[in-house]
Every structure is written in structure tokens, then in C-alpha cells.
């Protein structure tokens, strides 16, 4: 692990692409450990074992274990980033909405768009030697709006000294969950109102105001064609109305829900409870072609000390935005 020791002394490695994990992997490749007791661990996890830092379980160490040396202290921001990312993944329903994720290194990104007419969608027969019809792909007029979300962690030396890493990880997980919900709210706003390129979602109304019927869901399904209705987002009141439908209350559905927690879904679509969605709205979309997520790096952690007040500080941030791919791949139903 000599190469890894040299790497973690340089905290500037956090600023490189891939962060300290990527830098450690280059100097200490995991493939070198095949067939050994350390197989299955990445370079960062091997560094934790090297410094005997236990981050989970009943015998987890206190946070101060990271600061027993300058080398081990350089691992602390990566531990924070991973714990926050773990919380984001647990609370994240964006994979059910996003067709693709684009990683960028700057702050300016312009997506592409193809807006085929009904004639373009027909894909007419092409005779021998005839010209093949074209579908234009253009860059969007406006840039994707990126939003920076984050939180500053501030703790006294005393709190860190006696805080178990297992419990501290739970706190970081919750911060990750907050970031995931904020990003979900951004995604919903783009689905409903568009990404600034004059592409808001088409709207339709339920047959009876304040009430959701199975016929309304069928209407949403037909209005979305030729796209596939595979995801439905519902606010809390609308979620209750949908689950109260007689079509979703047969005995088999009830037994499955009690046994596994899985709800029967209308028309085979994933039904997602979305408190971030405005009350009185239901969104139906084709997750395979509705939304693009753009992120500038992953979770970024910056760490420093305030000596005069004996405080440790860690700033955790994540920058991301959303762009519509095909406008007609999402519809909003007003209830």
C-alpha cells in the first residue's frame, strides 16, 4: 500500500476527476487483490482497514479515529461523501423517472432535442433509390438549469471525540435523503413546467373534480400514447384516492401488499407516492424517454477547522439539473 500512502497525503486529489477513490484505485488497483482476503474491497475500504477504522457495527470507532494521523484524516471527507451518497440512494426514486444521467465537468450544458412531426413518426416506405426522410436533432435554445444543494455540518471537538461512526453515518444518510428529495422536487418542476425551452407537459382533467376514477387513469394511459405509461407520480391526497379504487382492492392485491409491501399498480405502471408533488396533480410518464438528469460531479465534501472555537466543519454539496427529452412523454392530470 505504499502508493496509496503517498496519494492520501495530497488532499488535492479530491479535486481530480474520480476524487480520492479514483486516485487510490490507480495507485493501488483492486485487481491486485484477487484471491486474497481483501478481494471485494475497493482502495478506500482497504485504507480504512489499514488504519483500523471501523465505520459500522456495534464495535464502530469514534469519529476521532479518523484524526489519529494526517494520512487517516485525509480519508474523512470521502467517508462523509459515501455516507451522504448512501442516504441519497436509499431515498432516491429518480431512477424511476430518469432515462439517462449525463455527467459534466463544467456548469454550462445544452441538451439536444428531436421534435418529429406526425408525418415524421409514420416512417413511410422508401422506394429503391429514393431519398430517405430525415429526423432533425438540434441543440436546445436554453442551457439546463443546475441547482446546487448542500448542508454544512458543524460539530464541536467534544461531540466528534465521543461520537460513534455508526450513529454519525445515520445523520449523514439523512442529509443524503434531504438532497435526494430536493432533487426530486426539481425533476417534478421540469416535468410539469418544462426546462425553459417552452416545453411544459400537456394537461388533462379528471371527469369529476376532486375525484379519481379508473376511467381517468385509462384516459391518462391513452393520452400518453404512443409512449408507454410505466410511471405514475401521485401527491399524498391523490395517492389515497388511487389506492381506494375498487379495481386495486381485490383479495390477491391485499395479500401481496400485507406480505411484501408491494402495491398493485394501475395498468402495470409503477405507482410512486410523491409528497413533493403539488396536491391535486398526478403525473404519468414514460421513464425511458421523458427526462435527462445532468450532474456536475457527485457528492463533494470540503472539510476544515475553526481553531478559535474548537469546531470541525464539513460542507457537503451536490449539483444537478434536469432536461426534458421528449415533451410528449409526460402528461399532468389535474384532479
Named regions from a protein language model:
Residues 1-7:
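Short, small-residue-biased leader/transition segments that mark boundaries at the very start
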Residues 63-149:
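Assembly/oligomerization interface modules of large self-assembling protein complexes
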Residues 137-141, 163-164, 194, 232:
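Hydrophobic alpha-helical bundles in membrane proteins
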Residues 149-224, 335:
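Alpha-helical scaffold segments that mediate packing/assembly in large oligomeric complexes
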Residues 246-335:
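Sequence/fold signature of self-assembling virion shell proteins
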Residues 195-263:
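Extended, solvent-exposed, turn-rich assembly/linker loops in the middle of proteins
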Residues 9-101, 306-307, 311:
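N-terminal catalytic cores of peptidoglycan-degrading enzymes
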Residues 122-124, 163-164, 241-243, 324-325:
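Short helix/loop capping segments that flank catalytic or ligand/cofactor-binding pockets
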Amino acid at each position: 500500500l505504499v502508493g496509496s500512502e503517498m496519494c492520501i497525503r495530497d488532499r488535492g486529489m479530491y479535486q481530480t476527476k474520480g476524487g480520492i477513490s479514483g486516485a487510490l484505485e490507480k495507485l493501488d488497483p483492486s485487481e491486485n487483490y484477487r484471491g486474497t482476503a481483501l478481494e471485494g474491497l475497493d482502495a478506500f475500504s482497504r485504507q480504512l482497514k489499514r488504519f483500523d477504522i471501523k465505520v459500522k457495527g456495534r464495535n464502530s470507532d469514534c469519529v476521532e479515529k479518523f484524526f489519529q494521523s494526517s494520512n487517516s484524516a485525509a480519508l474523512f471527507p470521502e467517508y462523509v461523501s459515501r455516507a451522504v451518497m448512501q442516504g441519497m440512494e436509499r431515498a432516491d426514486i429518480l431512477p424511476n423517472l430518469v432515462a439517462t444521467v449525463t455527467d459534466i465537468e463544467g456548469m454550462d450544458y445544452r441538451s439536444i432535442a428531436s421534435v418529429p412531426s406526425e408525418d415524421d413518426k409514420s416512417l413511410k416506405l422508401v422506394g429503391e433509390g429514393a431519398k430517405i426522410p430525415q429526423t432533425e436533432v438540434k441543440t436546445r435554445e436554453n442551457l439546463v438549469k443546475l441547482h446546487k444543494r448542500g448542508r454544512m455540518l458543524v460539530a464541536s471537538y467534544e461531540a466528534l471525540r465521543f461520537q460513534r461512526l455508526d450513529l454519525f453515518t445515520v445523520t449523514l444518510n439523512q442529509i443524503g435523503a434531504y438532497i435526494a428529495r430536493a432533487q426530486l422536487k426539481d425533476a417534478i418542476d421540469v416535468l410539469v413546467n418544462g426546462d425553459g425551452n417552452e416545453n411544459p407537459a400537456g394537461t388533462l382533467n379528471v371527469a369529476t373534480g376532486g375525484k379519481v376514477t379508473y376511467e381517468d387513469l385509462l384516459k391518462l394511459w391513452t393520452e400518453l400514447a404512443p409512449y408507454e405509461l410505466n410511471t405514475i407520480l401521485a401527491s399524498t391526497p391523490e395517492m389515497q384516492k388511487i389506492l381506494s379504487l375498487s379495481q386495486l382492492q381485490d383479495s390477491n392485491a391485499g395479500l401481496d401488499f400485507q406480505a411484501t409491501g408491494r402495491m398493485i399498480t394501475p395498468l402495470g405502471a409503477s405507482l410512486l407516492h410523491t409528497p413533493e408533488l403539488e396536491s391535486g396533480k398526478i403525473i404519468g410518464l414514460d421513464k425511458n424517454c421523458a427526462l435527462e438528469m445532468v450532474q456536475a460531479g457527485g457528492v463533494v465534501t470540503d472539510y476544515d477547522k475553526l481553531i478559535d472555537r474548537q469546531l470541525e466543519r464539513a460542507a457537503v454539496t451536490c449539483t444537478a439539473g434536469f432536461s426534458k427529452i421528449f415533451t410528449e412523454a409526460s402528461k399532468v392530470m389535474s384532479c
